[in-house]
Amino acid sequence: MIKTCIIGASGYTGAELAALVHRHEQFELATLYVSTNSADAGKSLGDIHPQFFNVIDLPLQPIDEDNLSALSDRFDLIFLATPHEASHKWMNELCAEKNGQKAVIMDLSGAFRIKDKNKFAEYYGFEHHADKLLEQAVYGLADWHQEQISSANLVAVPGCYPTASLTALKPLQQNALIDSTHFPIINAVSGVSGAGRKAALNNNFTEVSLQAYGVLGHRHQPEIADYLGTDVIFTPHLGNFKRGILATITIKTAANVTNQQITEAYQQAYQGNPIVRLRNNWPKIDDVVGTPYCDLFWKFDPKTGYLIVTSAIDNLLKGAASQAMQCANLRFGFESHRGLVN
């Protein structure tokens, strides 16, 4: 059994991770950690998230920040569902080898996703100082970076919007079907759970009305652009529903592209992949909530050369926890969908 802990287990993503690890026959959910100042310290996961009552009743233990390196001795796999700054602050200690052993780290924060450390001050609000780890971190886009993930000791699990967007766009980019003089335009709507569990007026369900935010400055824009290989125009929106993301993407295709080429690009990319579902109609958020799937559908206008693609995911699962589990599966030699789909 692969002995596993989760740091930041009280949040929405941490709880989803706990459920996935608990159900996986090859992983042992050994310990759940929260920060030392967390109001949830000492409680059980089932007390905070009642769906896990009498299912996962492990206590939420306050993490000892002065002895982080010892976790590499205790665990084979560490998930971090922590704020970006916490992952950045703790990572050197967590990755330190002790007694010749080093745990595999799956970081669900944004602290190691983008490679240009100078962008962190602009997009994340802190100066990045872990140059070596930033260079070593593998971007965990699980349906595209399988080989790199399989040997990585630090995986930066992608953000929710980048997951939805890159899954839709990479087959086109890989086959040179995008007009390089026109940036893809991504309009995406997320449920309020994407803002986290901490109470705030701007994500209070009764206060939320469909609204754009982070316009021309959201931290996921450089992440999408870096791993697509071209700039994009990305506009996120907050919707008044709990969970899920629907991204609608407008692409100007390269000259003389045909609908058959587009279809073949998607089929070649995702044939035999049970996680990415190529639909025969426009997906709804309800189709993917509570699942690890990414649902795609598209329509091409050959007269204008414009292509519209929709991508639907659960932001807490495919956009976070289940993709982290895909990465863990790959790293430990299992099929990426093991424990996620039948």
State each model region's role:
Residues L68, N202-V289:
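Contiguous C-terminal substrate-recognition/catalytic subdomains in enzyme active sites
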Residues I2-T206, Q211-Y213, F300-P302:
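N-terminal Rossmann-like NAD(P) cofactor-binding subdomain of oxidoreductases
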Residues L20, H24, E97, Y227, ...:
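Conserved short hydrophobic interaction patches
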Residues E16, T167, P171, E223-Y227, ...:
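Alpha-helical scaffold segments in soluble metabolic enzymes
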Residues A152, G244-T248, I308:
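Short, solvent-exposed beta-strand edge segments and adjacent coil->beta transition regions
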Residues T250-N342:
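C-terminal active-site/capping subdomain that shapes the small-molecule cofactor and substrate pocket
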Residues Y12, Q136, T163-T167, V215-P222, ...:
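Conserved active-site and cofactor/substrate-binding residues in soluble primary-metabolism enzymes
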